[in-house]
Amino acid sequence: MSLGACLAGWAVPALAALPDLAPLDRLLHRHVRAGEIHGVALNRVDYAAWGADSDHAAALAALENFDAGKLASHQEQLAFWINAYNLLAIQVVIEHRTQGSIRDAGGLFTPVWKIPAGRVGGREVTLDQIEHRILRPMGDPRIHMAIVCASVSCPDLRPEIYVPEQLEQQLDDQAQTFLANPKKGVVGDGNVRLSRIFDWFEDDFGGRAGVLAFVARYRGGNVRRVDGYFDYDWALNRQ
C-alpha cells in the first residue's frame, strides 16, 4: 500500500483538524530524565508517574480524536507519526504493566509490535503499522534515530515533541546524539561497530555505503568499514 493510500484511509469525518500535542509535550518534559542503565547513558522514562499523570489520557485522546488525513505537508506527517509511535510505545508498557522489556507485552505467536497499541482517528493501530506502513515509506532514515521502542539500545526519547517547523533540526540532533553514544550508537574510527539498527534497516540508509556516509555525516571522522554491531539491549528504559 502506498503512503498516500494509507494516509487517505485515516480521513474520518467529525475529528479534530489539528493535533493537540501539548499534553504529550508536558509528559515528555515531566517524566524523561537523563540516567544510565547497564552502563549505557540514556534518557530514562518514569513509566509509573507517566501513567498516573492525567495528561497521558489527554494525549491518547488527542490521537484518537485527530484526523491524520488532514495532515498537509510531509513535515507535518512525519512529526505527527513519530510522536504517535513514541506515545503508543509508552502506552503499551503502561497498559501491560511491563517491567523487564516491552517485548514481554507480546505473546509467542504475536510479537508486541503487532498487538493493538492504541487508536488514531478512531482506528486501532499497531507499532508495526506506524513504523513499516507509514514512517519508513516516507523515505527519511533519520526516523530510526527518533522512534523509541522503550528499550536501552533505542535512540534516546527526546524530552519534547517533534514539531514540523523544527523537525529538520530535531532529527539532525537525534542522529548526532545517537551516534555520539559509544555504548549503543557507534564506536571506533575508520573501522566501526554500530547499532544493530543499521543492520536491520540498512536498505533505508541506501545500503552499506549509505550507512557509512550517514555515520560520517553525523559523527564525523574517517569511516571506512563496518566491523560489527552491538548486541541490542531490550531492557526497559525505565527510571
Per-range role (PLM):
Residues 11-13:
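N-terminal signal peptide c-region/cleavage motif recognized by signal peptidases
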Residues 15-239:
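Interaction/scaffold regions that mediate signaling and macromolecular assembly across diverse proteins
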